[in-house]
């Protein structure tokens, strides 16, 4: 179990300054990867091929209730006071979240004037660790606070690494409605999740020693599968690829989406993503500890005739009352379901009045709109509301400026740039731009980058 926690720590810690949404990318028509956020989007081009391993790279993560500046700011306050403020200022609904995606390959082609088919594969890492408020306070305060109860229910985490093979179809029903769906086959490389943790720790006055410590109704379970090794030296880089393509821990899911056009200038879109399940049945190691335990510590007796291993006796007594069970039973894990919705109004001088050739269904130079996003997490639903402004500059550059209110802040400014030089599409997207000069002040940020080759042809 310790090895699992070490692995998750090294995966999560480098990214805890990033945020969890893709609102700059959503409904960005020029970019093929928008099809992964809404399979029913009005994608306007005829063919695309993603540059292998570079078509879509995104890193998103965040920490609610905490940023590095809160602790390390040079403001004259004691760092001990600042750490104390953080420890007692956060609660069990605060979380550390990271999501990373790497587009391994992606292809899209227009089957007819009304149908577009796309398929590909990407790798995804998603993890959420909730702040175990009582446990952190226990370690900070020590065990001498009499009769103060500390709950272990706040110890919750979920993490997974998986490969996703997908294929989707976008169908234009009529001039006003476009719908789409995407089938996903999951291959889990690693999964770890806690389940129904409960129990209470408190300290009372002892009879033999000063204090007596009590662990009551303790029941903790962590389920793991996939790339978990008893010895880290057993891991080989080839294991990552082998697991991804072996489908030893398979799953299935789907996305649905639509775009409804009320007029030439007014659009409404929506999508639901990752309605899916993974069956974890290979390399399953689940650990459960259950029981009650009371101790007044170790009472030392000095006798020249008896040599006693007090520590061994203590550990044996502990494990006899709190036995660790290792299970290999398969279990199911569910993908975090996501919902997107948007309203967009286009205006300004149309493309064709300046003699530019436009391949898009929306010929106007400017767009404004509103987006909503939510994702289902183990304890709380997370939300994001975004205002955006889009602007085209000629036929080669498109920009998108966003302002978001989310679970992390009320001042998230994002910017997206998408260029097209001949068939080459390059895009760069980022948010939390207000904190570029001092990223330590940000609770969240995200970065996305990709290169695609886009081609068009006319259908009769």
Pin down the residues of each PLM region:
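The feature marks either
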Residues: 14, 123, 140
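Short, solvent-exposed beta-strand-terminating loops
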Residues: 51-74, 121-137, 188-200, 277-289
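N-terminal, post-signal peptide beta-strand-biased segments of exported outer-membrane/organellar beta-barrel
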Residues: 19-125, 129
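Bacterial Sec-dependent N-terminal signal peptides
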Residues: 1-23, 455, 460
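Generic low-polarity alpha-helical segments
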Residues: 3-8, 49-51, 175, 181, ...
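Proline-rich low-complexity regions
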Residues: 14, 39, 336-338
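Outer-membrane beta-barrel porins/channels
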Residues: 22-27, 34, 135-460
